[in-house]
UniProtKB/Swiss-Prot annotation:
Protein name per Swiss-Prot or TrEMBL: E3 ubiquitin-protein ligase RMA1H1
RING-type zinc finger locations on the chain: 41-90
Gene expressing this chain: RMA1H1
Pathway(s) served: Protein modification; protein ubiquitination
Region span, Disordered: 102-162
């Protein structure tokens, strides 16, 4: 009789855990027990509860790091320390630079066991995640005056370098407006010389203004030399073409 009762109790227990609902409840219990995933807080050295991470990469419980920042800020009022520091690496930390970690799409509301009492401190709610529309958790430039000064100095250096580059670009004759005008003038003069050489009329040019380059020629020896070289080159080209034409007439 006792053996039959034991078998029925074992069968009932097995069927209870074998159902999907029983498995789901057991899995939820395991998840709630291991919500921290095995990571420990660097202050209380216990399984992390409401985890937050600093910009320097250290993991803390939100109540622990809030108390730490609170006591550091209170003690800094009576000393020269300006901002609370990380307990591990002594980097500057604040509530704005803490990044909350929300696992499995929610927040654990189960109170942590073994935590120190609040000591009269009202711990606010953990900051919202940036992904959920919270405020951006990067440190502002106003909190660090030295970085702000370095940034401004870099901007001033970049602004002083930019006109130098622009001056080097403008010094190029091809990019400056004056250089472009001079190049256009040279090409127009060479074109007029070629037009006059081919058609044998030095008084009529390809433009509506005859002798439009006489002033430039008379005022610039360099222009005179370039035009004379162009004239000789055109003469040689015309003579070569004439010889080719005569040769073609003789042979064909």
């Amino acid at each position: 009789m006792n053996q039959d009762m034991a078998l029925e109790q074992l069968d009932t227990t097995f069927n209870k855990h074998d159902t999907p609902l029983g498995k789901w409840k057991s899995m939820n219990d395991e998840v709630e027990e291991n919500i921290s995933g095995g990571f420990d807080c660097n202050i209380c050295l216990d399984c992390v509860h409401e985890p937050v991470i600093t910009l320097c990469g250290h993991l803390y419980c939100w109540p622990c790091i809030y108390k730490w920042i609170y006591f550091q800020s209170v003690s800094s009022e009576n000393s020269d320390q300006q901002q609370p520091q990380c307990p591990v690496c002594k980097a500057e930390v604040s509530e704005k630079t803490l990044i909350p970690l929300y696992g499995r799409g929610g927040q654990s509301t189960k109170p942590s066991e073994g935590k120190a009492p609040n000591l009269g401190i009202v711990i606010p709610q953990r900051p919202p995640s940036p992904r959920c529309g919270g405020h951006f958790l990067l440190p502002t430039t106003d909190s660090n005056p030295s970085q702000l000064l370095q940034r401004r100095g870099y901007q001033q250096q970049s602004q002083t370098r930019q006109p130098a580059y622009q001056g080097s670009y403008m010094s190029s004759p091809m990019l400056s407006p004056g250089g472009a005008t001079a190049n256009m003038l040279q090409h127009s003069m060479i074109g007029e010389v070629a037009y006059a050489r081919i058609f044998g009329n030095s008084s009529t040019t390809m433009y509506t203004y005859p002798n439009s380059y006489n002033l430039a020629i008379s005022s610039s020896p360099r222009m005179r030399r370039q035009l004379s070289q162009a004239d000789r080159s055109l003469g040689r080209i015309c003579f070569f073409l004439f010889c080719c034409f005569v040769t073609c007439l003789i042979l064909f």
